[in-house]
From Swiss-Prot:
Its main location: plastid. GO terms for biological process: DNA-templated transcription. In plastids the minimal PEP RNA polymerase catalytic core is composed of four subunits: alpha, beta, beta', and beta''. When a (nuclear-encoded) sigma factor is associated with the core the holoenzyme is formed, which can initiate transcription. HAMAP family: RNApol_bact_RpoB (MF_01321). It comes from Agrostis stolonifera. The keyword Transcription applies. GO terms for cellular component: chloroplast; DNA-directed RNA polymerase complex; mitochondrion. Belongs to the RNA polymerase beta chain family. It is found in: Plastid, Chloroplast. PROSITE patterns: RNA_POL_BETA. PANTHER family: DNA-DIRECTED RNA POLYMERASE I SUBUNIT 2. Pfam families: RNA_pol_Rpb2_2, RNA_pol_Rpb2_3, RNA_pol_Rpb2_6, RNA_pol_Rpb2_7. This is DNA-directed RNA polymerase subunit beta.
Amino acid sequence: MLRNGNEGMSTIPGFSQIQFEGFCRFINQALAEELDKFPIIKDPDHEIAFQLFAKGYQLLEPSIKERDAVYESLTYSSELYVSARLIFGFDVQKQTISIGNIPIMNSLGTFIINGIYRIVINQILLSPGIYYRSELDHKGISIYTGTIISDWGGRSELAIDKKERIWARVSRKQKISILVLSSAMGSNLREILDNVSYPEIFLSFPNAKEKKRIESKEKAILEFYQQFACVGGDLVFSESLCEELQKKFFQQKCELGRIGRRNMNRRLNLDIPQNNTFLLPRDVLAATDHLIGMKFGTGILDDDDMNHLKNKRIRSVADLLQDQFGLALGRLQHAVQKTIRRVFIRQSKPTPQTLVTPTSTSILLITTYETFFGTYPLSQVFDQTNPLTQTVHGRKVSCLGPGGLTGRTASFRSRDIHPSHYGRICPIDTSEGINVGLTGSLAIHARIDHLWGSIESPFYEISAEKAKKKKARQVVYLSPNRDEYYMIAAGNSLSLNQGIQEEQVVPARYRQEFLTIAWEQIHVRSIFPFQYFSIGGSLIPFIEHNDANRALMSSNMQRQAVPLSRSEKCIVGTGLERQTALDSRVSVIAEREGKIVSTDSHKILLSSSGKTISIPLVNHRRSNKNTCMHQKPRVPRGKSIKKGQILAEGAATVGGELALGKNVLVAYMPWEGYNFEDAVLISERLVYEDIYTSFHIRKYEIQTDTTSQGSAEKITKEIPHLEEHLLRNLDRNGVVRLGSWVETGDILVGKLTPQIASESSYIAEAGLLRAIFGLEVSTSKETSLKLPIGGRGRVIDVKWIQRDPLDIMVRVYILQKREIKVGDKVAGRHGNKGIISKILPRQDMPYLQDGTPVDMVFNPLGVPSRMNVGQIFESSLGLAGDLLKKHYRIAPFDERYEQEASRKLVFSELYEASKETKNPWVFEPEYPGKSRIFDGRTGDPFEQPVLIGKSYILKLIHQVDEKIHGRSTGPYSLVTQQPVRGRAKQGGQRVGEMEVWALEGFGVAHILQEILTYKSDHLIARQEILNATIWGKRIPNHEDPPESFRVLVRELRSLALELNHFLVSEKNFQINREEV
């Protein structure tokens, strides 16, 4: 991206910048805006006035470190001090008071709330303003409507009916004449007719009765209130009626806000000042005029495209935090008013400090924020699976959430890619499933204009006049409503020097159409081939050779890759790996130059300008997804370092580059059906040499409570009735020792809960004690923390958190080492995913002509139908790179250089590798990229040449250890009496419709009957079956129906249908009627 040396250099912006910019705007502007709105609290009886000032507010440094907040489950926050003034009679007091704590964003762009990293996603919403649309009714007549959307998301509609009357629909039920609405908003009929372009249409529809209703503002308000609130009878005009209307209608439906006012002025060509943020009668009349123009053909028939990004706005972290701050200040106002009343009852002299007390009033701020972060749908637990996930999570944009769409009701059009998304929202990166198209990711060069909430994309200006004025071409950021006026050359730039004219005719984008036009007519040009993609999409090499659906899967699966114990750089990459790793902040970067004094696994000591600085390292810390975060020092003692150099590397990074997987030797061939339907065959080398071994940390916690009788639980090693073997790892306090190896069922923390025995269970001696001395004999129940199934591992940390003597929480962290095994999920970077089906001894794997056994065998049938041919280019180029000891970083869309550029590159590198290593099999002209390989079991060559190569394969977080599950007995659902669902609840395996068909196909009637009735929901039979199975007896037959049949009968009864069944006696054919 450089040109003429360093002149006019363009770099990719910081990936976390969007979150930081939003938070800075909140701190610098939004806090002052909300404090300005805080009213003066007056108490007229006692001549008291309390006021907060926005000027000169201060935020203190957080009182605890980020690490301690996570360790002790606290909120990382900063105290806010504001100037306050209290007028009491003739006494004026000024003080700087603390009004509470505000959560502070850390260097990852996240917040720490109660010890958990959380992040706020950017929401994309319909912008406030007016939108017009026309649609045909069932008779084929065009209906024109205008929708006014307020800043709060409230909607009002303007419509013209068949009789050419104009109505305003203020909610779903009621519609009100436009004249009544305008009059209620303060206009008289004369003003209305003076301010519209079609007065004759306005005069044509009201009859005498309606004209009477709008004679005065009071009558119009009464009429409006009657229709809006659906109230009948005679109403009398009053102030309270006006207040109710103000609160219920005007505040919710008529506040346009700053963005809405700008949109309204633009759409209707008005010149109302920006500070008029409410809907005015002038707006309503101008909107109605436009609607009449559309209906009667005098206006332009321009339906608004609701999916165009110019009609959308971004609600960033700043907007959401500002709303919550306003809410907290509202609560603070009520609390201060209560305190003022209390002060006068006690007749004490108030000060600003006594009105805002830390215990009752200023706690409102932090509780408001903690509630927001805990319950708001767009506040999510920060995904820390790997460094890529940490970088990408803050760049998500979502249409879901309050005021937005829902996954069940969103239309296809609102999910689709729109031409205005180019360079702003990635056309590939979105979630799979019900939310497809509703959550997206920002393109790598996109930025958010926080003032107006639009997404901007950068372009190079290449217009002739500007080129004369300035030698250096300038980068312009275009918002979605501006780029419609430009001819934009698509990303076809060959050179990074954008002054070069490339071809006479180029493909371009203009007004959402794709054209081919002369180079002279181009205004701006895209600056980078990656410009249209998100980070996930930009990490896929040869993405232009893949189907978009597979690229989508790939960008999602890279976020699920587990950091491996020994990471490895990819041979074939795109060049974005370094910046992704850097912006994820998992590595330690030198902030100043100096000399390394010493390094160990916990800290690095750096001597810089006479001072020794200690730089702490992350050591086996658990992430939110149970992966292991760990930093390893990469600088030797005594080495001089420069500012910006890497001192220690985090998980899944090598040499400052992202390293999510491993380069392994793969072959595309079928092998005895073991790679049928995306299954993958692997060599035991991947297990024994710890190639795909990862570390995972599980957290287990237990808390002591006070029982209903008032006695406290206690943590102890002295637990009766338990085998010594289960308690072997406990120290004298009853907590597991650091470094001990624990297995399933072992006690991690011993705990006893006291219980008062019931009267009947007393022994005689206890009765005597109670009668003579009044002593209660207590018994204890064992409620220890046991290690659940699949939790075996090494204890690496134990935490005691003691808020008060009786409330103790103990957390135990256990490290697990997991090798790759059958059932684990692996994936490439092209959406080629599969499950490990078999681990073969290396001598049985197919081997190359130089005797090297293959590491993985993929099914070749997974490539043609899925059209992800990029994996073939990657594996062949990876083989050449491995042999030549080279790494490649390839920008996408290299076919713009020449036809078949990717293929030519791969073949030339394979030829080079063949020459260099003197191995003719690496590149054979008859079948380039393929080679004859041998069956490891027999030593015979396979019939056809096979494609081999080095691919970069990731191990995903979907691991068999966390999925596999079995149940013999367990909990049942209360209503249907069938086993509950899910591994977490120790549930059963559902036999559904298709499984029943499969069993029916084999005619196994008895097995079907057992599965569907006796074993499932027959209350008596299921206990007897267990007994019969253990003793090898015959399963008894039961005549009464299973529980699900009873549920059906009860449901029929609720519909007034009685259902009974009859039993016919075999002896005398008497009918015995029994109730179900």
